Amino acid sequence: MLKTISPLISPELLKVLAEMGHGDEIIFSDAHFPAHSMEPQVIRADGLLVSDLLQAIIPLFELDSYAPPLVMMAAVEGDTLDPEVERRYRNALSLQAPCPDIIRINRFAFYERAQKAFAIVITGERAKYGNILLKKGVTP
C-alpha cells in the first residue's frame, strides 16, 4: 500500500498509468465492453464503477491540453443517453481542475480508438454507454 494512492488503483493499473506517455489513450469501460477481442492490454477492475476509478486516478493523471482528452460513445440511432452517466464522470474528473469538454463519437469510431489504446480497464459499470477514453497529457 502506498500513501496518497487510492486503494481502488491496482498495482497493474498504477504501472500502466506510469508507463503511458503523452498522447497515449486509456479506456475505462463498462462491464459489457468487448475489450478482450481488441489489441490493447486489458486490466480487470470488476465491481468498481468508472466514476470511482476516475476520481481515484485523476490526481495522478494529466489530461492532454492539445487535443480533446475525453471521448465517450454517442448513442446509436434510436437509443438515448442517460445524462447522469456523463454528469458522474464530469464530477469525478473535476476534483483536481475544471473538467474539459467530453466529445462523443459513434460506436465504431470508438471501437477503432479502443483498438489503438494503451490499455482498456474493464470495470463493473453497468450503465449503458458507460465507456470513456482519456488521453494523457504532458505532466507540468
Swiss-Prot record:
The source's domain of life comes to Bacteria
GO terms for biological process, alphabetical:
fucosylation; L-fucose metabolic process
- What is this enzyme's EC? 5.1.3.29
Pathway where this protein functions? Carbohydrate metabolism; L-fucose metabolism
Q: Name one GO molecular function term.
A: L-fucose mutarotase activity
Major location category of this protein? cytoplasm
Which InterPro entries does UniProt cross-reference here?
A: L-fucose_mutarotase, RbsD-like_sf, RbsD/FucU_mutarotase, RbsD_FucU
Q: Where in the cell is it found?
A: Cytoplasm
Which is a Gene Ontology cellular component entry for this protein?
cytoplasm
Residues reported to bind substrate: D30, R107, Y129, G130, N131
Task: Name the residues annotated as catalytic in the UniProt entry.
Answer: H22
The protein's annotated catalytic reaction(s) are: alpha-L-fucose = beta-L-fucose
Record key words, sorted? Carbohydrate metabolism, Cytoplasm, Fucose metabolism, Isomerase
Give yes or no: UniProt keyword NAD.
no
The UniProt function text for this chain reads: Involved in the anomeric conversion of L-fucose.
According to the record's subunit comment, the protein's assembly and interactions are:
Homodecamer.
Q: Which family does it belong to?
A: Belongs to the RbsD / FucU family. FucU mutarotase subfamily.
Name of this protein: L-fucose mutarotase
Originating organism: Shigella flexneri
- Gene encoding the protein: fucU
